[in-house]
Amino acid sequence: MQHISVKAFAKINLGLLITGKRQDGYHTLETVFSPINWYDELTFSAADGLGMSCSTIDLPADDSNLCLKAAKALREYAGIDKGVAITLTKRIPFGAGLGGGSSDAATTLRVLNALWELDVPQGDLHGIATGLGADVPYFLETKGLAYATGIGEILEDLEASLPFHIVTVFPGEHISTVWAYRNFYPRFVRQAPDLKQMMKDLCLRSDFSVLPALENDFEPAVFDHYPAVRKVKEQLLEKGGFYASLSGSGSAVFGLFEELRDAENAARFFREHFPVALTEPFFTMQ
């Protein structure tokens, strides 16, 4: 092996309902993940030990990095001492609710499982992924839309993809997941919508009547504390989006567009101020 370069894509959340809190302190949720065309690039090179470098000094390249955590977890599971040098070119904003770190970890697991010829059973790989982060199994196991419950690790592949243009904007605020869970406004007692059926109605029939129920429970608190993030959502709708929402715990916000022209105009507008990604219809992770 000289080196192998792969893309690690980001995700957005279509609806995010916080449904309860477990005894171990983790919150349970219900959401639908969708991939977007915003990615980090990871390069894996032969090495005697484990090492890592990162394109930005804002992220650690030490044992706290999820890529190295993933490599070490895989080595420990397999009882091996193989090495690899990982180079991370970071493009997905962190603290954005886009799952960049989780995607990097999942990519590391998938690539090293193949490079080290481990053939780890899917169930065991899922367990390793969940130990690294609740979003990691999504990036490891699916390519398009997926319905998630538990803490985000229980997945059902919806075998579909969004038939719309997606404009995703990072307003520059780094919001920690810990902060978001401490500050969201609980709404545990309610009649939860059927997210799976709503996604089918939206993707297969363009049934926009389901959109008001696609809520993100982090939005009210995030918007109260970060009014600039609220403004981005409002502007996405003003620019022609038929739906806009916070992704995850933020601060990234995305809008769905029927017309390419409107999506391109919106992306052009926001690029004057913030990092932006434009994703084509029916996008899947490859």
From Swiss-Prot:
SUPFAM superfamilies: GHMP Kinase, C-terminal domain, Ribosomal protein S5 domain 2-like. One of its GO terms (molecular function) is 4-(cytidine 5'-diphospho)-2-C-methyl-D-erythritol kinase activity. It catalyses: 4-CDP-2-C-methyl-D-erythritol + ATP = 4-CDP-2-C-methyl-D-erythritol 2-phosphate + ADP + H(+). It comes from the Bacteria. Keywords: ATP-binding, Isoprene biosynthesis, Kinase, Nucleotide-binding, Transferase. GO terms for biological process: isopentenyl diphosphate biosynthetic process, methylerythritol 4-phosphate pathway; terpenoid biosynthetic process. ATP binds at P93, F94, G95, A96, G97, L98, G99, G100, G101, S102, S103. The active site is at K11, D135. The keyword Kinase applies. It is an enzyme of class 2 (transferase). The keyword Electron transport does not apply. Its EC number is 2.7.1.148. Pathway: Isoprenoid biosynthesis; isopentenyl diphosphate biosynthesis via DXP pathway; isopentenyl diphosphate from 1-deoxy-D-xylulose 5-phosphate: step 3/6. InterPro entries: GHMP_kinase_C_dom, GHMP_kinase_C_sf, GHMP_kinase_N_dom, IspE, Ribosomal_Su5_D2-typ_SF, Ribsml_uS5_D2-typ_fold_subgr. Gene3D superfamilies: 3.30.230.10, GHMP kinase, C-terminal domain (3.30.70.890). Catalyzes the phosphorylation of the position 2 hydroxy group of 4-diphosphocytidyl-2C-methyl-D-erythritol. Belongs to the GHMP kinase family. IspE subfamily. This is 4-diphosphocytidyl-2-C-methyl-D-erythritol kinase. The lineage of its organism: Bacteria, Pseudomonadati, Chlorobiota, Chlorobiia, Chlorobiales. The gene is ispE.
